[in-house]
Swiss-Prot record:
One of its GO terms (biological process) is positive regulation of cell motility. Keywords: Cell projection, Cilium, Cytoplasm, Cytoskeleton, Microtubule, Nucleus. GO terms for cellular component: axonemal microtubule; centriole; ciliary basal body; cilium; motile cilium; nucleus. The gene is cfap-20. Belongs to the CFAP20 family. It is found in: Nucleus; Cytoplasm, Cytoskeleton, Microtubule organizing center, Centrosome, Centriole; Cytoplasm, Cytoskeleton, Cilium basal body; Cytoplasm, Cytoskeleton, Cilium axoneme. Its main location: nucleus. This is Cilia- and flagella-associated protein 20. The keyword Cytoplasm applies. Cilium- and flagellum-specific protein that plays a role in axonemal structure organization and motility. Microtubule inner protein (MIP) part of the dynein-decorated doublet microtubules (DMTs) in cilia axoneme, which is required for motile cilia beating. Involved in the regulation of the size and morphology of cilia. Required for axonemal microtubules polyglutamylation. InterPro entries: CFA20/CFAP20DC, CFA20_dom. Pfam families: CFA20_dom (PF05018). The lineage of its organism: Eukaryota, Metazoa, Ecdysozoa, Nematoda, Chromadorea.
């Protein structure tokens, strides 16, 4: 999808305020919903994914399973709200050995497991809105000893609220981010800078 796009800085793949936030996403929902609502905390439109079973309630990008994103930027960032329910997301990449690997983070797992084609890891989220920063290059190197080449697919499962999903060439400070990439919390009048912790230690 983005193979022929010049990639630098920030590359957004989902923005909840956009006219068609799920334009490049496929929706798979059973016993749940994906809908745009106004979040009371930030007083802004967000995308809510909820489901009784996280494995049957998710969105994925690109829509066509035979196509790939082709995003080479190494930082995957999501601005999401902790709904105090099970939540997971998955990023599929390809490394310099031309092997496809999947990284799955969830808030209900207690230990990291590294298998040849999938690495699952626990994710700790703070209350309310979180900015999840996922260093794909670092995780590929630590889990498999190979080099990150590009991201192929993304899958975001219930249960969460999403403000924005984007890729970046590096980590940006609050001051460096464009205004539309920031998350303002009107009640406290300040930026949310919460970033979850990932555990990458072997069992």
């Amino acid at each position: 999808m983005f193979h022929n796009t010049f990639q630098s800085g920030l590359l957004s793949v989902l923005y909840s305020i956009g006219s068609k936030p799920l334009q490049i996403w496929d929706t798979q929902i059973k016993n749940g919903h994906v809908k745009r609502i106004t979040d009371e905390e930030i007083q802004s439109l967000v995308l809510e994914i909820m489901g009784n079973n996280i494995s049957t309630a998710f969105i994925s990008c690109p829509v066509d399973p035979d196509k790939t994103l082709g995003i080479k930027l190494p930082f995957f960032v999501m601005v999401v709200k902790n709904m105090n329910k099970y939540f997971s997301f998955e990023v599929q990449i390809i490394d310099d050995k031309k092997i496809k690997r999947r990284f799955r983070a969830s808030n209900y797992q207690s230990a990291t497991r590294v298998k040849p084609f999938i690495c699952t890891m626990p994710m700790r989220m703070d209350e309310g809105w979180n900015q999840i920063q996922f260093n794909l290059s670092d995780f590929v190197k630590r889990a498999y000893g190979t080099n990150y080449v590009e991201t192929l697919r993304i899958q975001i499962h219930a249960n969460c609220r999403i403000r924005r999903v984007y890729f970046a060439d590096r980590l940006y400070t609050e001051d460096e981010l464009p205004a539309e990439f920031k998350l303002y919390l009107p009640i406290r009048g300040q930026l949310s800078t919460q970033s979850p912790a990932f555990a990458m230690t072997s069992e």
